[in-house]
Regions:
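Conserved catalytic core of the tyrosine transesterase superfamily
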Residues: 1-324
Length: 324
């Protein structure tokens, strides 16, 4: 198979994309660019290069070279997809025994962690009233209770939205999460249906206590499971994760903190500040409901008393009600 034959196969494959699959000219242009790069890699193997000689090892080497150049995982994945399709087509045209791209994967995408706020900024965010809202309104009191609890306990926004005032089980409904104000503890159901209990700091407890009388005024008859919800909208329905996200965003904007503040930023700030204050990674993983750092998906077994001790010593908002 000479260079002319190789080019003929490339042209034939691109023609098939236009004819049989009816791909757009822009998409075919992208395929052509990726295949030219494959040809360049193959030519570098030696003078007598041919596609039939390309092996699984070569493809892995090509992908590694792309990664070393700084190409993103998504771009490498696109090229591998184009190459895989070409070799599938080539196997139909020739005696190619196997597809050398099969099983080769692009490097995993690195998910950047959300930016953590400085402790002073986080406290300012959750403790300050919204200058654009009435300090005594139901919305203002609900917002402060929610934001304090997000940062105090490092909850996911879905876990916060699912909280009930107390554990409830009736008429086929069972609480996924609830708060124990007397015990200063919140219990939630996290990923993988794993339940965990997390301490709640004094400022969050006080903010929730201030919200509860307003909550009672929003309750309506025949609300079903909404009646158990800890956080309610002005219409008396359970607060959704989306509404919580929007409220936090608008609150941060009103305080001049920024437009990209979101609930997970408070969760990440909780984790960062706990680690900075305690250095106890295993305890923080347990508080967050994460798998171990070794990605074993096994939760670290620490008793709640130990978690509470770490929390009290390390968290900047862990001051007890009695410590006012």
């Amino acid at each position: 198979m000479d260079a002319a034959a190789n080019q003929s196969y490339l042209n034939g494959y691109l023609d098939s994309l236009a004819g049989q699959r009816q791909l757009s000219a822009h998409t075919i242009s992208n395929y052509a660019r990726d295949l030219r790069e494959l040809r360049a890699f193959t030519q570098a193997l030696g003078e007598q290069w041919e596609f039939a000689a390309v092996s699984h090892f070569h493809i892995r080497k090509f992908a590694a070279q792309l990664h070393a150049r700084g190409l993103s995982p998504s771009s490498i994945a696109r090229k591998l997809s184009a190459w895989r399709g070409f070799f599938e087509w080539l196997a139909q045209q020739t005696a190619l025994a196997s597809n050398p791209v099969e099983g080769v994967k692009a490097p995993k995408r690195v998910k950047p962690l959300p930016k953590a706020m400085a402790a002073d900024d986080a406290i300012h965010l959750v403790a300050s009233g919204n200058p654009l809202a009435d300090a005594g309104s139901s919305m203002a009191l609900c917002n402060q209770a929610m934001f304090e609890l997000l940062y105090s306990s490092g909850l996911r926004v879905s876990e916060l939205a699912g909280l009930d005032l107390r554990y409830t089980r009736q008429d086929g409904y069972e609480s996924a999460g609830w708060i124990d104000l007397d015990g200063a503890e919140v219990t939630v159901t996290g990923k993988g249906s794993k339940k965990r209990s997390v301490p709640v700091g004094g400022p969050a407890i006080r903010a929730i206590a201030a919200w509860l009388p307003q909550r009672e005024t929003l309750l309506k008859a025949d609300q079903g499971e909404h009646a158990a919800a800890l956080f309610l909208t002005e219409r008396g329905s359970r607060m959704s994760a989306r509404v919580i996200q929007l409220r936090l965003k608008h609150h941060a904007q009103a305080l001049g903190i920024g437009s990209n503040v979101h609930p997970h930023m408070l969760r990440h700030s909780f984790a960062s500040h706990m680690l900075q204050g305690s250095g106890d990674l295993r305890a923080v993983q347990e508080l967050l409901g994460h798998a171990s750092i070794a990605a074993t998906q096994v939760y670290t077994s620490l008793d709640f008393q130990r978690l509470a001790q770490v929390y009290d010593a390390a968290h900047p908002r862990a001051k007890k009600i009695s410590d006012k």
